[in-house]
Structure formats: C-alpha cells, structure tokens
C-alpha cells in the first residue's frame, strides 16, 4: 500500500473507504469491479491503484480498517470498562450505531467478507478473524463482575450466545437493500431491556 493514501484529506480517505465498502458489499470479492469503487469515490481507477497495489490489497485494507474503526469506537465508548453487562452492551450498541451512520455499507461488507470463500483473500480473512475474536472475547469479559450472574454461569459462553444472536439479527437485516439504523437501535434496546 502506498502511504500517500494517508496524506489525503480525511474526507477523501472516507470517500474511498465508503466506496470500497459499498461495492464489495454488493458483490463477491471476485465480482466487485474496482472501476465502480473508483467512480463512487470520485477518483480514477489508476489513482485508486496508485494508493492500493491491487484489488486484494484494497480488500484486505478495508477488512483491517473495519476492525480498527470498530475497536477504536468500542474502546472510546467505555463499554469494556463496565462491570455491568447491560451498561456495557448499551455503550457498545451506541458506538456501533455511530459507525453504521458514518460508514453505511461497512456492516454489510464485514458480513460478506466474513463468509467470503475466494482463495485470494480467505486465508488472510481467517487469520484476522482468529486474532480479533480472541481480543474481543477476552476484553469484553475482563471487567464483568461475576457476582452479577448466577453462580457457575459460563460467562464466555453467555457472551458468545448473545454475540451469535446479534450477528444473526444483523445478517437478517443486511438481506434487505437498505439498513435502517434507527430501527436497529430500537430493536437492540428492546433486546437489552428484555
């Protein structure tokens, strides 16, 4: 990757990120035209490849950028510092909703990339998933007060159960053409308060 990408104004960087998220979220890795990404970002295809050596590098950069954006937002929200599960979930929800508002296609891109089978990107995606899954589980459970739960409850399994249910909900919502962030917020608040 050409470091000149980071010298671009933030607005231009975000235009390229959002264009990549959008196009890759609509197609498989292989069938995503880089010309559409360039057009959506308002740059030429040759300039896109000036910043990113090839399509694979752009795709994997976007994948890692999603993880970075998410981790930074969650850490900034303070959700990992909470000892109460529901306070933690609420703060995490607000952080993720803000991400969805700023990067409307990022969630769909993440879900598509998570299930992508193209051998060009699959090994790198799987390696990254393993790295971040360990971080996420350990960080979330680190500060929870076990006294707030039934004795003997497996906190990690409880967390994974809620994570998988959330992922299923998001996957269902992503099957529609347009994500309604306000609807997602209302549904998750109902689930947290249930």
Located regions from the model:
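Generic hydrophobic, amphipathic alpha-helix propensity
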Residues: 12-20, 37, 62-70, 136
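Short coil/turn segments at alpha/beta junctions that flank glycine-rich nucleotide-binding fingerprints
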Residues: 26-30, 81, 103
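N-terminal intrinsically disordered/low-complexity leader segments
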Residues: 1-10
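Short amphipathic alpha-helical elements of helix-turn-helix/winged-helix folds
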Residues: 19-23, 99
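Helix-turn-helix
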Residues: 15, 23-57, 61
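Amphipathic alpha-helical packing segments from all-alpha helical-bundle domains
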Residues: 68-79, 83, 87, 91, ...
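Short, hydrophobic secondary-structure boundary micro-motifs
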Residues: 108-112, 122-124, 152
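Short helix-capping/turn signature of helix-turn-helix
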Residues: 52, 112-118
């Amino acid at each position: 990757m050409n470091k000149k990408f980071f010298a671009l104004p933030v607005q231009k960087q975000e235009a390229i990120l959002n264009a990549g998220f959008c196009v890759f979220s609509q197609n498989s890795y292989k069938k995503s035209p880089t010309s559409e990404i360039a057009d959506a970002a308002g740059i030429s295809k040759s300039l896109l490849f000036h910043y990113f050596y090839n399509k694979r590098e752009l795709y994997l950069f976007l994948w890692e950028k999603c993880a970075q954006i998410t981790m930074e937002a969650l850490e900034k929200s303070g959700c990992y510092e909470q000892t109460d599960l529901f306070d933690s979930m609420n703060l995490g929800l607000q952080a993720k909703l803000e991400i969805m508002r700023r990067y409307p296609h990022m969630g769909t891109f993440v879900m598509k990339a998570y299930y992508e089978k193209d051998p060009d990107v699959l090994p790198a995606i799987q390696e990254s998933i393993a790295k971040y899954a360990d971080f996420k589980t350990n960080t979330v459970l680190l500060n929870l007060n076990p006294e707030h739960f039934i004795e003997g409850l497996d906190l990690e399994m409880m967390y994974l159960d809620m994570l998988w249910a959330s992922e299923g909900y998001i996957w269902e919502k992503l099957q529609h053409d347009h994500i309604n962030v306000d609807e997602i917020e209302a549904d998750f608040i109902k689930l947290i308060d249930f």
